[in-house]
């Protein structure tokens, strides 16, 4: 009996250690190499296949300096205003999310920063649980410890979902506006950013009033967005 208990404890601990060693190795690799495909992309494409949707993956990596500053400002203004200064976690946002989750009785709000969203996109899935949030936090801490902010943001910009099968700034710019990501205007960047929290909903409801309202909010906030240092030199 004691041996069984030991195995029941050791097995999940071993899996946790192995997974995080795998993740850490990939984080080191991604400091210099673009991901071939993220875990979230694979999960989403499998979901489309199971639903019988004929969706092709459109994922085009471009370097940081070939993405419009307008899009960078729009995303920071909307998703993580303190990105340039925090260590991966917005503690005020996390406390607010915990309160909302406690009131609802479910894990709905996440208080996720750009770094946390990237951790999910690279290595995790769409599930919502405190265990998954804990794993997301561990990955975020590892990534922030060994990766500079520009690279974290570059990885994020290239992995965001924007439509059915459309991932990354370049693919989204080409899909919606037939231009490279480097040429996005403020209005275009704000409208793309407004889609980020619910890209598939807005893919099905492109004339949503909520999308228009969110676009206007992003436009108003863009002027105060603080970018990582290399964009302010």
Curated annotation (Swiss-Prot):
Transmembrane segments annotated in the record for this chain: 8-28
Protein name: Biosynthetic peptidoglycan transglycosylase
PANTHER family named in the record: BIOSYNTHETIC PEPTIDOGLYCAN TRANSGLYCOSYLASE, MONOFUNCTIONAL BIOSYNTHETIC PEPTIDOGLYCAN TRANSGLYCOSYLASE
Catalytic activity as recorded in UniProt: [GlcNAc-(1->4)-Mur2Ac(oyl-L-Ala-gamma-D-Glu-L-Lys-D-Ala-D-Ala)](n)-di-trans,octa-cis-undecaprenyl diphosphate + beta-D-GlcNAc-(1->4)-Mur2Ac(oyl-L-Ala-gamma-D-Glu-L-Lys-D-Ala-D-Ala)-di-trans,octa-cis-undecaprenyl diphosphate = [GlcNAc-(1->4)-Mur2Ac(oyl-L-Ala-gamma-D-Glu-L-Lys-D-Ala-D-Ala)](n+1)-di-trans,octa-cis-undecaprenyl diphosphate + di-trans,octa-cis-undecaprenyl diphosphate + H(+)
Phylogenetic placement of the source organism: Bacteria, Pseudomonadati, Pseudomonadota, Betaproteobacteria, Neisseriales
Pathway it works in: Cell wall biogenesis; peptidoglycan biosynthesis
InterPro entries, per the entry: Glyco_trans_51, Lysozyme-like_dom_sf, PBP_transglycosylase, Pep_trsgly
Keywords: Cell inner membrane, Cell membrane, Cell shape, Cell wall biogenesis/degradation, Glycosyltransferase, Membrane, Peptidoglycan synthesis, Transferase, Transmembrane, Transmembrane helix
The species this protein was found in: Neisseria meningitidis serogroup C / serotype 2a (strain ATCC 700532 / DSM 15464 / FAM18)
